[in-house]
Regions:
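Non-heme Fe(II)/2-oxoglutarate
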Residues: 1-87, 108
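Short proline/glycine-enriched turn/loop segments at secondary-structure junctions
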Residues: 3, 110-111, 193-197
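Residues at beta-strand starts and edge strands
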Residues: 9-11, 96, 117-119, 200-202
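Short, cationic low-complexity segments
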Residues: 39-41, 141-150, 224-233
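Active-site region of the double-stranded beta-helix
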Residues: 64-94, 104-119, 123-132, 220-222, ...
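A structural signal for short, well-ordered beta-strand segments
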Residues: 98-100, 121-123, 204-208
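Catalytic core of non-heme Fe(II) oxygenases with the double-stranded beta-helix
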Residues: 103-181, 214-220
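Catalytic core of Fe(II)/2-oxoglutarate
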Residues: 161-233
Length: 233
């Protein structure tokens, strides 16, 4: 009798956070104000979402209006680590940067990864059911035994696949609702659907880094920052 074994999964954490309408409205207005005060609008291309980290607003975790949100995110990060059986007591966790994104009409976010951090989050502060969904892309493609098999438009058009599922796909379209939080490795390539109409979709992104509390016997992990020495350049 045949058996199929699936190894090396990508684990994405999803949870719904509890925020009052007043809290959410205050954060939404704060994000809209940031958009009005953009410092780098030449960087924003047509049909691309507004991203606060490129406009001078990359430290939402230090903004008191977002305090409760980041407290809840903190707790969810610890739950994520528990699911991977990571002893977080041996690690120092830092919010490295955090920002808002605004998608209007057919604006989208190109596929990308956050290579300067370890974990990333996406929280949906304002989202309608029909707004664009997040997509995750598989850069390993362990099952793609023929080069370009999974991503070829011509092969898909020729019905080379009887059906598409997680075993033979190089991307996943993942549905979320307002108040949902996602946590995933920062190296994961992700973006949003293109050509979808958005009713001012507002999400909060954040990057998290991990440092060893004590690196005295460790070959890997980033050592404690208090032992670093800054260059005089």
């Amino acid at each position: 009798m045949q058996k199929i074994f699936n190894f090396f999964p990508l684990t994405v954490y999803k949870s719904s956070l509890s925020l009052s309408d007043n809290e959410k409205n205050e954060m939404i207005e704060e994000v809209r104000l940031m958009e009005k005060k953009s410092k780098n609008l030449d960087y924003k291309s047509p049909n691309k979402a507004w991203t606060g980290d490129t406009q001078g607003f990359e430290y939402l975790h230090n903004n008191l209006k977002f305090k409760n949100l980041f407290t809840q995110i903190n707790n969810c990060i610890l739950e994520y680590l528990e699911n991977l059986s990571i002893n977080h007591k041996k690690l120092d966790l830092y919010f490295q940067r955090s920002w808002a994104t605004i998608s209007k009409n057919t604006e989208h976010i190109d596929s990308h990864s956050h290579d300067q951090s370890h974990l990333s989050i996406a929280f949906y502060l304002k989202k309608q059911k029909d707004d664009a969904k997040i997509m995750f892309f598989d850069s390993s493609k362990h099952n793609e035994f023929i080069p370009q098999l999974f991503g070829s438009r011509s092969l898909a058009k020729d019905n080379i696949f009887k059906k598409r599922d997680i075993l033979n796909s190089s991307r996943v379209v993942f549905d979320t609702n307002e108040d949902d939080l996602l946590i995933f490795p920062s190296k994961t390539i992700h973006g949003t659907e293109q050509g979808k109409s958005n009713s001012e979709r507002i999400s909060i992104s954040a990057d998290i880094v991990f440092l060893a509390k004590d690196s005295s016997t460790l070959e890997h992990l980033v050592p404690p920052v208090e032992n670093w020495k800054k260059f005089s350049n």
